[in-house]
Amino acid sequence: MKTLVFDCEQLRKPFTGFYSYCDNLARALVNQTPPNGPRLSFYVPKTFEGSFGPSADYQRWRSLHKFYLPVPDSTALWHVSSQQSKYWPSSHRIPMLVTIHDVNFMHMQESAQRQAHHRRLYEQAIRRATRIVTISESAKKDILTYFDIQGRTVDVVYNGTEACPANVQAPAVIPERPFLLNINRICRNKNVHVLPALLVGNDLDLLIAGPVQDKDYAQEILREARRWKVEDRVKFIGPVHTAEKHWYLQHCQAFLFPSLAEGFGLPVLEALQYYKPVFCSDHTSLPEVGGDCVFYFDHQFQPEAMQALLEQGLQANLSRTAIDAHLSRFTWDKAASAYWKIYQEMI
């Protein structure tokens, strides 16, 4: 029987978009498996073997596979889940679908050496790909603009959103004041340093959740907080588990996402599920994902314009009907169905 392998080695990296992508899509692929389709197999770290049910097979990830990755003879297709992957089947006979999540490095101020490193990774992924998927039209446009894809088909398959859990776990420490919320990795392209200015003239806290990847940038955020004299109301709360994340989304006054470069921007949709005012940048994929349901910061992030927008948005009456219609475009079942269609065309 033919086997389709979905590479989930990125499950090694919790609190990341890649983790969420692999976990949610894997579960949806199992649910959407067509009758008489190929057998699903997941390439996973040891601790995730069996995670997606007994109907699938599991191949264990090993770090040495970056040098040599053997695959069973039954493998008819290998789906590489990220352009950053270092784990490629050693056999070149196997068709490969590669998901490219973003081309963010082209939108960031990086050293020539760092940019060249990223470009090599992307070029390797494109060379090995039989077909490419991006997770937004914005990412597709970037791929076609910055790389020679040599005639390969590029499809767009949107990510989905996780369903809101029935029971939300309160965090160990509950904020004392009403709060604005930002969830993301703490690094420069997330642009979080523009947010402390939004605390001027109100009694709100700013909670910043996520792993600190750039300690120097975290200090820059705190310097901005001191400049606006709101340092006592800017709180770094670190990475949050899924249940805690949903509690913060459910209880925040508004969700803020000023990122300069996103392949998709899933947190925007997660906040909309709770009908919260969402304020984000108008860069890369975010207008595509937020649509008419979010408020867009001034392109240059002028503090006065951002403050006025926040005040306006906090008082706005949001249309739940419009938000529900927008969210219905982004489900993991729809994503899995689209991937299965591509798989069957490739096998």
Region roles according to the model:
Residues 1-347:
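Carbohydrate transferase catalytic cores enriched for Leloir-type hexosyltransferases
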